[in-house]
């Protein structure tokens, strides 16, 4: 059973930390912290994908990219191994940051360990909650971030990234991906990735 006060305080602290993101995104004419928006969107998707999401899953969804801007991509080589090193460092950082907040607000070690496992994507393919978090993450990427990369990436690279994204998704997640409202260009690239 969710302790509403403790949960609300944990979410407030996670949101406060993500609200410090210097990168901004315009939403309805208002500049908002990018990581805060991303975390909220992932949480919203988790709630759509899972009828009764656990407290741990909701905490992981909100904190799985906690203060991502603190470890920029350009600190690592622009290679596939460099990308993987960066992602591994990010996951550990996010898990540590989230665990610190959860400990401060009084969560048990059992809950903290579970949230860390979800953030670190431990055995996520065999874990329904891990799959839901991955689906939510992928759906938010497709829905809100893909368009921004189109001018940066070559078409072949974009299709390759989309293929990898789709391979990570469950059948339910793929069903939702097919119903996203995307630009014509994004929809065409997604279609190419599926074929």
Model-derived features: where do they sit?
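Generic, well-ordered alpha-helical segments
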Residues: 34, 38, 49-58, 86, ...
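His-Asp-centered metal-binding catalytic motifs of divalent-metal-dependent phosphohydrolases/nucleases
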Residues: 55-76, 98, 117-123, 137
């Amino acid at each position: 059973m969710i302790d509403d006060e403790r949960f609300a305080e944990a979410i407030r602290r996670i949101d406060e930390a993500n609200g410090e993101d210097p990168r901004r995104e315009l939403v309805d004419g208002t500049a908002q912290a990018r990581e805060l928006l991303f975390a909220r969107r992932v949480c919203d998707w988790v709630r759509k994908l899972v009828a009764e999401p656990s407290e741990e899953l909701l905490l992981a969804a909100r904190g799985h990219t906690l203060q991502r801007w603190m470890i920029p991509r350009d600190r690592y080589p622009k290679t596939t191994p460099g990308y993987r090193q960066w992602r591994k460092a990010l996951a550990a950082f996010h898990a540590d940051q989230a665990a610190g907040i959860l400990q401060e607000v009084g969560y048990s070690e059992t809950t903290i360990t579970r949230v860390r496992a979800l953030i670190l994507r431990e055995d996520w393919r065999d874990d329904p909650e891990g799959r839901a978090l991955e689906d939510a993450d992928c759906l938010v990427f497709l829905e809100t971030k893909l368009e921004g990369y189109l001018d940066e990436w070559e078409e072949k690279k974009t299709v390759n990234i989309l293929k990898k994204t789709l391979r990570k998704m469950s059948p339910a997640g793929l069903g939702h991906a097919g119903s996203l409202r995307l630009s014509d260009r994004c929809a065409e690239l997604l279609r190419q990735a599926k074929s």
